[in-house]
């Protein structure tokens, strides 16, 4: 009797992982990207934690993380990555007539390096492509982190 296909696939993954040292394994989280329009109290707590981990320059032109979240909810530009009913990363996505602009991308410090930011970016690229719009990144001028992300993703970078 052969095991079901799912069991065979899991066994194959285990065989592959057995040959990779634990220190070299990257754990990607199954993150679901969504527009945040009616956040729950827990979502608001998660968003506050996400942007509490943001460097000060990332909040520009907003006076605070709270102001950024409030403005993004008001204009419908807030997107977030969810895993196990918790928001782990967020960004602002402005859907313009000529192009879409992604800005203020931030992931909670405790979940960085697990694919949350990459998942937000990939889903944004997919949605922009489906809408027939080019995607551009936007960040305050002169920040190396934003320039590095633009270079890695081959996306144009606009100044906020």
Could you tell me what each predicted segment is?
Residues 95, 108-114:
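Active-site acidic-Proline motif in GNAT/NAT acetyltransferases
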Residues 80, 86-94, 101-106:
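Conserved beta-strand in the GNAT
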Residues 22-62:
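Short amphipathic alpha-helix that is part of the acyltransferase structural core
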Residues 138-140, 154-160:
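Conserved catalytic-core motifs of GNAT/GCN5-like acyltransferases
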Residues 128-141:
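Conserved GNAT acetyl-CoA-binding A-motif
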Residues 55-78, 82-83:
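Active-site rim helix/loop that mediates acceptor-substrate recognition in acyltransferases
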Residues 146-155:
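Conserved active-site tyrosine of GNAT-family acetyltransferases
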Residues 113-126:
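Conserved acetyl-CoA-binding loop-helix of GNAT-fold acetyltransferases
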